[in-house]
Design a protein with these regions (language model features):
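Bacterial Sec-dependent N-terminal signal peptides
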Residues: 1-31
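Short, conserved micro-motifs composed of acidic
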Residues: 25-336
Length: 336
C-alpha cells in the first residue's frame, strides 16, 4: 500500500546563505525586484533525498532557517518509514531574479529529540506542524502504524517559548476523536482552526474526510475525546484513491489516481467557493508526470510574491524511489 502528509509554513524573505553556500547576493547590485519570486522550475531537493523513498514533509516557521521533517525509509534500507529532518536554503536575487536552492540533512538537538519521541519500529508517516494561537502551543501531528498494520493519527504538543524542555515532558497521544478501525492519516487543519481534514479508507478506497473542531483553545480535549462526526468531502473525492489533503487559504491540493490524469497519482487542487469545495482541477504537465506525484505541501515567505509547493515524485530524474521536489505556485491564479 502506498502511503504518504503536511506543511505549515511562514518564513522570512531573502535568505542569504553563507558558510560554504553558493547562494549569495552582492551588496553593490541595484534592487530591480522588490519581492522575491519562487520560480516555476522544478527543483530536486537532492541534498536531503536518498536512494530510498522520501516524502511526507512538514516545515515549521523559523526565521532564517527552514528545517523540514519528512518520512523516509532510508534508515531501514527500505523496510520502514521514520520521521527525519532535513534543511533547505534558498535565495532570490533582487538584481537579476536569479534563484538558487540548496539542501542537506539537519542535525539539531530539538529535532533529534522530536524524532526519538515519535519513531518506533513501525511506520511513521505524514508529519504536520501547527501553532495554535488560541492556547499558545505548537502541535506535531503524524500517523503511526498500529499492531494490526493500519495507520492511526497521533500528536504531541510543546511550548514554542521553550521547545526543547517542554518537549522532554511530552509524549505522543492517540487522536481518539478521529481514529477508526481503518487507515487514518495525513491530517491538516484549516486557517480558522474549525475543521480538520484527513485521509481514511473505511469505504475501501482512500477518501478525503473532515470533522468539525470544537473550541480550539481546548483542542487537546477534543482530539482525545469521543469519536467526532466524520464526513466525506464529496465534491473532491472520486471512486478511486484521493488522499493527502493540504490546505492554504481557500486552496486544497491533494493526490489522486483517478482516471484522466497524466500518470499514476497526480496532484489536483480544489477551490473553496460559496461554502463548498469545487470540482478538482489537475495541476497539469508542468508538475505532474507519467509517474507518481504525491504528498503536496504549500509554503510561503514574507516578501515573496508567490508561494512554493513541495511534493514527492518517483520520476526517473530523482536519486531513487520517491524524492522531494520544490516549485513556485501562484495561489491567486489557482483561485480564479
Amino acid at each position: 500500500m502506498k502511503r504518504a502528509i503536511t506543511i505549515y509554513i511562514t518564513t522570512f524573505l531573502i535568505l542569504v546563505v553563507t558558510g560554504g553556500s553558493n547562494c549569495s547576493k552582492k551588496d553593490d547590485n541595484p534592487i530591480n525586484y522588490e519581492a522575491g519570486i519562487f520560480p516555476e522550475e522544478i527543483y530536486n531537493l537532492e541534498g536531503i533525498n536518498s536512494a530510498y523513498d522520501d516524502y511526507n514533509v512538514s516545515l515549521p516557521q523559523i526565521a532564517g532557517e527552514l528545517p523540514l521533517m519528512f518520512s523516509s525509509n532510508r534508515n531501514s534500507q527500505g523496510s520502514q518509514f521514520d520521521i527525519v529532518t532535513g534543511f533547505i536554503f534558498f535565495a532570490f536575487s533582487q538584481y537579476d531574479a536569479g534563484f538558487c536552492i540548496e539542501s542537506s540533512m539537519f542535525d539539531n538537538t530539538f529535532y533529534n529529540s522530536l524524532e526519538q519521541k515519535v519513531n518506533t519500529g513501525r511506520d511513521e508517516l505524514g508529519p504536520y506542524r501547527l501553532f495554535n494561537g488560541e492556547n499558545g502551543f505548537e502541535y506535531f501531528f503524524y500517523a503511526e502504524e498500529n499492531a494490526l498494520g493500519d495507520l492511526d493519527l497521533k500528536y504531541l504538543t510543546y511550548s514554542p517559548a521553550d521547545p526543547y524542555n517542554s518537549l522532554l515532558l511530552a509524549e505522543p497521544v492517540e487522536i481518539t476523536a478521529l481514529n477508526s478501525s481503518s487507515n487514518d492519516a495525513y491530517i491538516c487543519i484549516d486557517n480558522d482552526l474549525t475543521t480538520v481534514y484527513f485521509t481514511n479508507d473505511g469505504d475501501g478506497d482512500f477518501d478525503i474526510v473532515k470533522a468539525m473542531i470544537g473550541d480550539a483553545s481546548s483542542l487537546n480535549l477534543w482530539l482525545e475525546g469521543d469519536p467526532a462526526g466524520v464526513s466525506v468531502v464529496d465534491s473532491v473525492n472520486s471512486d478511486f484513491n484521493d488522499k493527502c489533503p493540504f490546505l492554504r487559504n481557500d486552496i486544497m491540493i491533494f493526490t489522486s489516481d483517478r482516471p484522466g490524469g497524466i500518470g499514476g497519482y497526480d496532484l489536483y487542487y480544489s477551490v473553496y467557493r460559496n461554502g463548498k469545495w469545487s470540482t478538482p482541477y489537475n495541476m497539469g504537465p508542468d508538475i505532474n508526470t507519467e509517474h507518481n506525484e504525491y504528498r503536496p505541501l504549500i509554503g510561503s515567505c514574507p516578501d515573496f510574491s508567490n508561494h512554493f509547493l513541495i511534493f514527492s515524485s518517483d520520476r526517473p530524474a530523482g536519486l531513487g524511489g520517491y524524492d522531494l521536489y520544490l516549485t513556485g505556485i501562484d495561489l491567486e491564479l489557482l483561485a480564479e
